[in-house]
């Protein structure tokens, strides 16, 4: 039963676990339905791979989990020992530029904030901040690098990575940073967002 019983409902208990509801007048109902979705393909992580299990993810949105995992993997693949780099570069000489053009739209971010109430759930105080588009940079900084240099994102759909790369290059050229971490992360494969992509004809 809803938390607030409509005024045109008459609710009578019938058993310990069941009630009888009599509705006076017309009533609208939302019923589940099914249809074949136009989009048949989308890039996803391999089945069974959950980056959130590899660090204390605390219900982080999927895109942020991917960011932390990818950043950690990248540091292990640069050909240099990261601790050696840290000993030679001050923490305020490291910059991070990474973002998500779509933002964090799954149930742990903005998506959860937008639909929690109509699903009868509570809106968490984490939904809004974790949905911000620059959060990949903030999370790489906080969870992986711990730097005190420039942190942020430049957004531009498919060109987001290139825009962030430009910011990193400028930091090095201007002497603001000696090490720059650049990237982008998107995790928009949710039913609502896929509807938008389908309408655009962006996916096959």
Locations of regions flagged by a protein language model:
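Acidic, glycine-rich active-site loops and adjacent beta-strand->loop/helix elements
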Residues: 100-103, 156-160, 184-189
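Secondary-structure boundary elements
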Residues: 76-84, 146-147, 170-180
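Conserved catalytic cysteine-centered active-site region
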Residues: 23-65, 104-167, 198-204
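Conserved active-site "lid/cap" helical segment
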Residues: 1-98, 105
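Non-transmembrane alpha-helical segments in soluble domains
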Residues: 72-75, 141, 169
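Acyl-CoA/ACP chain-elongation machinery
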Residues: 176-204
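Beta-strand segments within the central parallel beta-sheet cores of soluble alpha/beta enzyme folds
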Residues: 85-96, 150-156, 180-185
